[in-house]
Regions:
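Non-catalytic, mostly N-terminal accessory regions of nucleic-acid modification and defense proteins
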Residues: 1-194, 253-266
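Intrinsic disorder/low-complexity signal
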Residues: 11, 294-295
């Protein structure tokens, strides 16, 4: 009798199962932060390696193989030896894995100014996860097989799956919502942001911007003709948004820090061509009686 072919488990389900082994150390609501921070390291390395091989193949450029400028010009992050995925993965079962990850993030920010303040330095060490449990998650990410053209889809799939799995689409205490991908897709189709400035005052992890870029790609447009502006109050979501956009090669201005767009507008002079947002409609007591009375945005 022929053996039954083993059904392949989808990537996002495998990652979720690996995260479940971290229970007790990590709240399920934080799974997505844990995973996407590691996916960023894997994707950054894969893109770096492709660019590195491209430079080495050309006699005129191979002398610049360790010059960060020859990576950043193509929206690729330059990685030193200790920031590369094989080095990180080689330490996956060692007690210094969290220090290795922090060193990688620190060096990446140092070598790539666009990442300054965006990476979760110290995050994994603060979780105090037992290294043996953490290594199983790294193993799942290491086994991933995908093409670089699928990077956007992999990130999106994992993010949506994790949020849907834990019902974050429902109302939360902080008034935050996850906007389903089909809704974001409909919004971009309606406004058709072929070029100009796109603004989201409560951008979360940057999903509106990603979909805008996908819309441009689908219509054979040029991503460089759209300018991204945004703001996010949650520190974790702010970092996720910057990583999310950076790994896709999308330049953006999300302000120098996370901030509440109601009370601290980081783009006071911006006149955007398009505004895409899913505001926290159920947020209560978001200002005092005297706050914002002189704010130009609320006059008229």
């Amino acid at each position: 009798m022929a053996k039954k072919e083993k059904k392949q488990v989808p990537l996002e389900a495998s990652l979720w199962a690996a995260c479940n082994k971290l229970r007790g150390s990590v709240a399920a609501t934080d799974y997505v932060n844990v995973v996407l921070g590691l996916l960023f390291l894997r994707f950054a390395y894969d893109k770096f390696q492709v660019q590195r091989e491209k430079l080495l193949k050309n006699e005129d450029t191979k002398i610049f193989v360790d010059n960060p400028k020859f990576y950043s010009r193509d929206n690729v992050f330059y990685l030193g030896e200790k920031e590369r995925w094989p080095y990180i993965n080689a330490h996956s079962k060692q007690n210094d894995i969290y220090q290795v990850i922090d060193t990688a993030y620190t060096n990446m920010e140092k070598n790539n100014p666009a990442l300054k303040g965006a990476l979760p330095i110290g995050y994994y060490a603060d979780l105090h996860i037992e290294p043996s449990k953490f290594s199983s998650l790294l193993d799942e990410i290491n086994k991933m097989q995908y093409s670089l053209t699928q990077t956007d889809d992999v990130i999106g799939r994992v993010y949506e799956y994790f949020l849907r799995k834990f019902c974050i689409a429902a109302k939360s205490e902080k008034g935050e919502f996850y906007t389903p991908g089909n809704i974001v897709d409909l919004m971009t189709r309606i406004i058709q942001p072929y070029q100009g400035s796109v603004y989201d005052p409560c951008c979360g992890s940057g999903g509106m911007f990603v979909q805008s870029a996908k819309f441009v790609d689908a219509h054979q447009g040029n991503r460089k003709e759209i300018t991204i502006y945004g703001q996010e109050n949650s520190p974790k979501s702010y970092r996720l948004a910057r990583m999310n956009l950076a790994i896709r090669g999308l330049s953006c201005d999300l302000g120098e820090e996370n901030a509440d767009s109601f009370l601290h507008d980081l783009h006071p002079k911006l006149l955007a061509d398009y505004i895409l947002a899913n505001p926290p409609f159920n947020l209560k007591a978001w200002r005092t009686e005297k706050q914002l009375t002189e704010d130009d945005r609320w006059k008229g």
